Amino acid sequence: MDGGKLTTVDLKSIIINDPFWNRYIDLVDHVILPFQWELINDQVEGAEKSYCIRNFRIACGDEKGDHKGMVFQDTDVAKWLEAAAYSLAKKRNPKLEAAADSAIDLIARAQCEDGYLNTYYTITGEKRWSDLLEGHELYTAGHMIEAAVAYYEATGKNKFLHVVCKFADYMCTVFGKEEGKIHGYPGHPEVELALVKLYRVTKMTKYLELADFFVQTRGERPCYFLNEDCVKNQNFIFPEFKDFDLDYNQSHMPLKEQETAEGHAVRAVYLYSAMADLAYEYQDKELLKQCEILWNNIVEKRMYITGSIGSASYGERFTTDYDLPNNSNYSESCATVGLAMFSNRMFQITRDGKYTDIVEKALYNTLLAGIALDGKHFFYVNPLEVVPEIAEKNPTYRHVKTTRQLWFGVACCPPNIARTLASLGNYVYASEQNTVYVNLFVGSRIETDLSSGHVELLLSSDYPVKGDVTLEITPEMDGQEFTVGIRKPSYSGKAELSVNGIKEAVCLEKGYLYLTRKWKAGDKITVVFDVSFRFVRCNPRVRDNIGKVCLMKGPMVYCLEEADNGKYLASDIMDSSVPPKEEFDESLLGGTMCAGLEGMRIDYSRVGDTLYEEERPSYIKDTFKAIPYCCWNNRGKGEMIVWMREK
């Protein structure tokens, strides 16, 4: 943990202008945020009701009625506000800001005199903090805090920040080691990382100390949850909790003893993100080491090639090493967001490019697969193989949706996707003292202050269609000396770097190319990475992928879809000895780099109705078209497959 922690570049100082990402970023500003505002106000016909804003109106006395929705329904508006804040940080939008301010006014009026804020417990009158296992009070508080911090940093308005500070002050009087306080912790981690954010913006150490208390206390014996009424009397809000062991919420042992990622995937990576934050703030090398162990277990043994996590639908959880089924997995969009958050924090502490590789994998694949290109339909679950006729009839796959949905009763994923896209700049760059880091190759312009002075960078690329990346440097004054660190992706076997057309020898350290020199206005760094198509194979311990290949280009995973290749994709066999052909399809989804593959398929015209027989099926040679996994299901319902049989 040598040196200071890297910091992200202020979103106000980043302008993204990228041929690939613009369509998604523009969706957030022009479609997703207005649409989700209508959704949380229950104004979209045909979508599941949110009841979120309605609950706040009831809680503050504007309306009469019962609480509806989940115990954590308040987080719908919290995550929407956070996404709105990131959007406003880039560009002021009076209409969006007015909507956000109206929601904040409502939240402020729903807050209790002592600072408590939660519509479910306020409206129902149920006892506060009586069901930490599943009541989600602290989880909901965490998302409120994250939203308030983001809104303050984006707009300078402090009303929402004051609301959550009052709430956090109250929580500090309720929870802690002291006698008379509750010695418990959240059933769903989230407030821990939020309290660290609140500490960083307010410098109030009691918020950091409370976050540390929650993390350090988790898993102690006797387990706090076992003494709660819901467990003792089997009186659960969520009936399935009766089947879950303590590893479901990572409370089965102290965190510094946990070496495998267990339980609910979102809970896990939110918790690990907080652990990474606290490891830095307290310079706790032991806690950081535990983060590394857990991260390695996820990435090396429990993560899908698309950057998604959570193999089982029941419990939305991790299972065991190398258990990665393709058609029944859960792979929740929120879990992918959490993995990106955890990985980005680990990069900021260690400056190791392996963590950013996973951020990139998660963002380019599962995150984008979670949203349709109309910005109004979403996936909660992200399988790697779908046969609609089976998924819709077999209850084993009841969690798998064969088309994206308008909204969900548990709608954590749509606003989570929105807030991640809106804050993309946080993942693209980082800086420390006199070094600026380029992590993702997203066309953009940034301004930042280093110890040597002000610096402006203009990044141009058509990544990952092409591997060329150009950085134009504008220092505060000619002769200004500083370092540029550019990530060399692990999938690029080579990287050619030049400055003003002249090749440069650079230092490669932990996946980053470092170039230190005295810069002048107009200097251009050009890096060429290898993003050609490649076939990737899986560790044979993953039974589902034996004898199969996956096609990738740069960080992007590709798949076969019924719209291009017909039915029975699981029987198609790819000839990996034939290099894939680049096929840019202007008409597909606004222009998409596809791949032409050669192989063979079963001749189903010669297949009869006999269920079992001795004769082998007949194969015929054919060509196939693969598209980016993130683009699947934008042309109607149909089969999809990522892992293809290999000749």
What name fits each language-model region?
Residues M1-D76, D101-Y120:
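Low-complexity, Ser/Thr/Pro/Gly-enriched N-terminal "stalk/linker" regions
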Residues S13, P19, A211, C291, ...:
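C-terminal beta-rich recognition modules with glycine/proline-rich loops and embedded aromatic residues
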Residues D18, I25, D29, W37, ...:
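Hydrophobic core segments within long, regular secondary-structure runs in both alpha-
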Residues W21, L81-P94, G142-K157, E192-K203, ...:
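Well-ordered alpha-helical scaffold segments within catalytic/enzyme domains
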Residues S50-M70, N118-H136, P186-L198, E228-H264, ...:
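Carbohydrate-binding/catalytic loop surfaces
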Residues T124-V201:
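A conserved hydrophobic secondary-structure block that centers on an alpha-helix together
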Residues H188-E190, L195-C223, N233-I309, S313-T320, ...:
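Active-site neighborhood of glycoside hydrolase catalytic domains
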Residues G479-V499:
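Beta-strand-rich binding/interaction modules
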